[in-house]
């Protein structure tokens, strides 16, 4: 049993967070293709409220590396465990099949953390990008990666290994590199087990250094107990490593086993924070209660 299981919700879901699922036919079609190809999407695994809208617009986010994550973040719906599936050598081709069948124009690739693999899953991204482009080289591909950290007891070796894994992904030339900070600095230990604030900022900084033509992107969830000042401080830290794109969205508790919502930020508060982010110099900002990492990613 999770330590959060006995903490009941204290507020009802506000009206602004209730929305229809969207285009039911598009949703059913994509769900059928995903099931047929034995794939995973973060849209479904994470129960994203925007998935119907995104499917209808010709975008989807595929989850690579199976459905079991080696990290145990307190907010995430994805199944967790230390014995994930063996890497499926046919996964990349099945993703490419689905992208072709869905006639997608913009694809986001993400992955569960695979701390059990020597490259921490870097090749999952590159082989899938290669398979998609073999069918249609004009498809734009964004990557949303884990931090590629671990496997080296020496800190300097760990940084070098992280940069090597990152370089592998960047060499495949995604149109955008996304790595989420997820929450403010104070809440990292509770929310992102196995990851750190500084490590994520370092990854984004390394991306700008290694591939300055590839834009970087990051996201924050609100509603975990952070203050407005802490959110702005995190945005400043992201700009300090030249992160160019930002998403801000409301955290929604997937189940009673997950960390509770502290409060629901209003649409007006999201608008105000979005304005602050633009003033700080972010080139692209998506800020709203239902915004997620890949929301309107193709815009």
Curated annotation (Swiss-Prot):
Positions contributing to [4Fe-4S] cluster 1 binding: 43, 48, 54, 294
MF (Gene Ontology): 4 iron, 4 sulfur cluster binding; lipoate synthase activity; metal ion binding
Annotated disulfide bonds: none
Span of domain Radical SAM core: 55-283
EC number, UniProt record: 2.8.1.8
Catalytic activity: [[Fe-S] cluster scaffold protein carrying a second [4Fe-4S](2+) cluster] + N(6)-octanoyl-L-lysyl-[protein] + 2 oxidized [2Fe-2S]-[ferredoxin] + 2 S-adenosyl-L-methionine + 4 H(+) = [[Fe-S] cluster scaffold protein] + N(6)-[(R)-dihydrolipoyl]-L-lysyl-[protein] + 4 Fe(3+) + 2 hydrogen sulfide + 2 5'-deoxyadenosine + 2 L-methionine + 2 reduced [2Fe-2S]-[ferredoxin]
SUPFAM superfamilies given in the database record: Radical SAM enzymes
Primary enzyme class: transferase
Cofactor notes: Binds 2 [4Fe-4S] clusters per subunit. One cluster is coordinated with 3 cysteines and an exchangeable S-adenosyl-L-methionine.
Pathway(s) served: Protein modification; protein lipoylation via endogenous pathway; protein N(6)-(lipoyl)lysine from octanoyl-[acyl-carrier-protein]: step 2/2
InterPro entries per UniProt: Aldolase_TIM (IPR013785), Elp3/MiaA/NifB-like_rSAM (IPR006638), Lipoyl_synth (IPR003698), rSAM (IPR007197)
Residues involved in [4Fe-4S] cluster 2 binding: 69, 73, 76
Leader peptide range in chain numbering: none
Annotated keywords: 4Fe-4S, Cytoplasm, Iron, Iron-sulfur, Metal-binding, S-adenosyl-L-methionine, Transferase
Location(s) in or outside the cell: Cytoplasm
GO cellular component terms listed in the entry, alphabetical order: cytoplasm
Cofactor(s), names only, from the UniProt record: [4Fe-4S] cluster
Gene3D superfamilies, per the entry: Aldolase class I
Family note: Belongs to the radical SAM superfamily. Lipoyl synthase family.
HAMAP family: Lipoyl_synth
Full protein name: Lipoyl synthase 2
Species of provenance: Parasynechococcus marenigrum (strain WH8102)
Primary gene name: lipA2
């Amino acid at each position: 049993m999770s330590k959060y299981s006995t903490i009941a919700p204290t507020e009802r879901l506000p009206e602004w967070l209730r929305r229809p699922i969207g285009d039911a036919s598009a949703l059913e079609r994509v769900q059928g293709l995903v099931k047929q190809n034995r794939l995973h999407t973060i849209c479904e695994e994470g129960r994203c409220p925007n998935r119907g809208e995104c499917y209808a617009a010709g975008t989807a986010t595929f989850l690579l590396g199976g459905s079991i994550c080696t990290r145990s973040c307190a907010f995430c719906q994805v199944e967790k465990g230390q014995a994930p599936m063996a890497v499926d050598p046919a996964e990349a081709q099945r993703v490419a099949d689905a992208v072709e069948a869905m006639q997608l124009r913009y694809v986001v690739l993400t992955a569960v953390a695979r701390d059990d693999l020597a490259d921490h899953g870097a090749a999952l991204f590159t082989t899938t990008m290669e398979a998609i482009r073999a069918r249609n080289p004009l498809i734009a591909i964004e990557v949303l990666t884990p931090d590629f950290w671990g496997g080296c007891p020496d800190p300097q070796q760990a940084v070098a290994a992280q940069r090597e894994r990152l370089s592998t992904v960047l060499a495949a030339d995604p149109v955008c590199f996304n790595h989420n900070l997820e929450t403010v600095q104070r809440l990292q230990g509770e929310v992102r087990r196995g990851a750190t604030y500084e490590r994520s900022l370092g990854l984004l900084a390394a991306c700008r250094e290694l591939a300055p033509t590839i834009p970087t992107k990051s996201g924050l969830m609100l509603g975990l107990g952070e203050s407005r000042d802490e959110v702005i401080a995190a945005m400043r830290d992201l700009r300090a490593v030249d992160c160019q794109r930002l998403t801000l969205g409301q955290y929604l508790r997937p189940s009673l086993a997950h960390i509770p919502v502290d409060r629901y930020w209003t649409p007006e508060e999201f608008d105000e924070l979005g304005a602050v982010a633009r003033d700080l110099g972010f080139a692209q900002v998506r800020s709203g209660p239902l915004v997620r990492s890949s929301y309107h990613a193709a815009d």
